[in-house]
């Protein structure tokens, strides 16, 4: 029997990441080849932006995707999130020239408070949310705080781009296919402070630490390279990573919806207090997924170097939260 369509909200739908994302979602790459979807696309209520969104919708029509049951484009969050089952919050205020990080946090807080409240009012009670727009962890925390009637654990931040980057760099170093890299972890914030941890990682079944066998490379080259990859792409391309970010968002939601078959992936989650991370802090941790559910990988040993790196990224997250606390009471 044909499945009932699910509603997928995408914010920032006419932007670079939105454009790289929507066609793959509509083709079934996110929720599977037999799951019809209704796309609910949100963009700024500005004529020029809404016109661009209309153009994207025309292209979606022209693809004649069998799984795309319906779609709407709107400037109203209450319309975009109505009965939504999945939300990909891509739209965020980018950092402008001379803009302090603090100002960026406050500008984005307004957006994610409004969207959190809209979801709280009209979305499915089991909506699953990923925040892609930066600062992703703190934006996800703000949205979660602004939607008190929805399950806190259904709000997540995208660490999958860092996770995929970390896997790819390790595969390159070891000369093995990226598919052979397993049990990668990226702890903390989606920012250059995050900590890609390869201590439990295997490549072709071999311990990654033994294969690499170079602590100095790992600490001084690999970790900073993964952390600064986004900046390197901006320098090379003149634009921020869009297709790889869209790909990571699809990976994240695909695995959450359909499961990982026991494989570890990284998700930014509200902490349950494990690994010494204060409860509620939106923090990247390793998980495995079964359809519709994630489960944290527990009981991993944290050595002194890891503790230092994990606390460093936590400090940044705590400062970000403190910067917007007044707004999300």
From Swiss-Prot:
Record: active site: 190 (proton acceptor)
pH relationship of activity: Optimum pH is 8.5 with oxaloacetate as substrate.
Pfam families, alphabetized: Ldh_1_C, Ldh_1_N
EC number annotated for this UniProt entry: 1.1.1.37
Classification via SUPFAM superfamilies: LDH C-terminal domain-like, NAD(P)-binding Rossmann-fold domains
Binding locations of substrate: 95, 101, 134, 165
Influence of temperature on activity: Optimum temperature is 60 degrees Celsius with oxaloacetate as substrate.
Domain of life, per lineage: Bacteria
Coiled coil start-end: none
UniProt-recorded Gene Ontology molecular function terms: L-malate dehydrogenase (NAD+) activity
Keywords assigned by UniProt, alphabetized: NAD, Oxidoreductase, Tricarboxylic acid cycle
Enzymatic class: oxidoreductase
Catalysed transformations (reactions): (S)-malate + NAD(+) = oxaloacetate + NADH + H(+)
Cited NCBIfam families: MalateDH-SF1 (TIGR01759), PRK05442.1 (NF003916)
Cited function: Catalyzes the reversible oxidation of malate to oxaloacetate. Catalyzes the reduction of oxaloacetate more efficiently than the oxidation of malate.
UniProt similarity note: Belongs to the LDH/MDH superfamily. MDH type 2 family.
Subunit structure: Homodimer.
Protein name: Malate dehydrogenase
Organism of provenance: Syntrophobacter fumaroxidans (strain DSM 10017 / MPOB)
Gene designation per UniProt: mdh
């Amino acid at each position: 029997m044909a499945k009932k369509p699910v509603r997928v909200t995408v914010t920032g739908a006419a932007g670079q990441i939105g454009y790289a994302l929507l066609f793959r979602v509509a083709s079934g790459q996110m929720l599977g080849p037999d799951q019809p979807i209704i796309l609910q696309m949100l963009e700024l209520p500005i004529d020029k932006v809404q016109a661009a969104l209309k153009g994207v919708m025309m292209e979606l029509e022209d693809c004649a995707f069998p799984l795309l049951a319906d779609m709407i484009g709107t400037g109203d969050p209450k319309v975009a999130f109505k009965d939504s089952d999945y939300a990909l919050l891509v739209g965020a205020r980018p950092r402008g020239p001379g803009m302090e990080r603090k100002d960026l946090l406050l500008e984005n807080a307004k957006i994610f408070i409004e969207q959190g409240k809209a979801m709280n009012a009209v979305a499915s009670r089991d909506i699953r949310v990923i925040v892609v727009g930066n600062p992703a962890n703190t934006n996800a925390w703000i949205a979660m705080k602004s939607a008190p009637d929805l399950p806190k654990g259904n709000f997540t931040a995208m660490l999958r781009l860092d996770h995929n980057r970390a896997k790819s760099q390790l595969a390159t170093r070891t000369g093995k296919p990226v598919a052979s890299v397993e049990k990668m972890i990226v702890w903390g914030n989606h920012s250059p402070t995050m900590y890609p941890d390869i201590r439990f990682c295997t490549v072709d079944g071999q311990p990654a630490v033994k294969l690499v066998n170079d602590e100095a490379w790992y600490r001084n080259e690999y970790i900073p390279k993964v952390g600064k990859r986004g900046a390197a792409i901006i320098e090379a391309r003149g634009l921020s990573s869009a297709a790889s970010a869209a790909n990571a968002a699809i990976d994240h939601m695909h695995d959450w919806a359909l499961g990982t078959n026991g494989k570890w992936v990284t998700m930014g989650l509200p902490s349950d207090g494990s690994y010494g991370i204060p409860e509620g802090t939106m923090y990247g941790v390793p998980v495995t997924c079964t359809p519709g559910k994630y489960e944290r990988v527990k009981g991993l040993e944290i050595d002194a170097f890891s503790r230092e790196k994990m606390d460093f990224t936590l400090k940044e997250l705590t400062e970000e939260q403190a910067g917007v606390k007044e707004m999300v009471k």
